[in-house]
Amino acid sequence: LNKDQFTINVSNRKIVQGLIDELKIPEEKQTKVIRAIDKLDKPGFGLKGVEDLLKKERKDQSGAITKGADLSDDQAQQILNFLKIKDLKQLKETLKNPLSQEGIKELEDVFEVLGYGSNLNQVKTNFTIVRGLAYYSDFIVETNLNFKVTNNKGKEVDIGSICSGGAYAKLISRFRGVDIPGTGISFGVD
């Protein structure tokens, strides 16, 4: 692949977790909130679809209803405002929660390191990348192709994400009873 054919989106789960904590969203609703945010870039969702999932429910094109997180209007609006932020400076000025600030600092450190060794213009911050799985704890990465391919029916399709992953501090403890931090990625094409 040429450098202009892919984008590496990076974020930090601590940023959104700090926002969730600041909004005092109960633990039993947090997974639904994360999964709603994770759907922002999925076909048929956008901000309206996320808003529906943050509130009462979302009805898709087939008529199927997905129960939402049942957040207050204010909580949902603050999350939607967060999703519109595009740069670290604005994010740093907006989110004051210590956990969010820690995640922002860690992202700044990533970009500082990248700046020393390369000119990776294809690495971008994308705060909506949260990965819907609860075991991610901080750094998150998602790599997307920037071009379409022709499928076996002759139709141009967007492949989207081909490599995703991140850091997880407590995943192994589910199986071994000991906290061992790790980082992992997976490759795949639908």
Predicted feature locations:
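Internal, well-ordered domain-core segments that constitute the primary functional module
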Residues: L1-I25
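Positively charged, Gly/Ser-enriched RNA/tRNA-binding surfaces
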Residues: L1-Q5, K14, E51-D190
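Generic detector of bulky aromatic hydrophobic side chains
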Residues: N9, P26, L40, Q122-K124, ...
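Short alpha-helical interface elements
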Residues: I20-D21, V33, D41-F45, R58-I65, ...
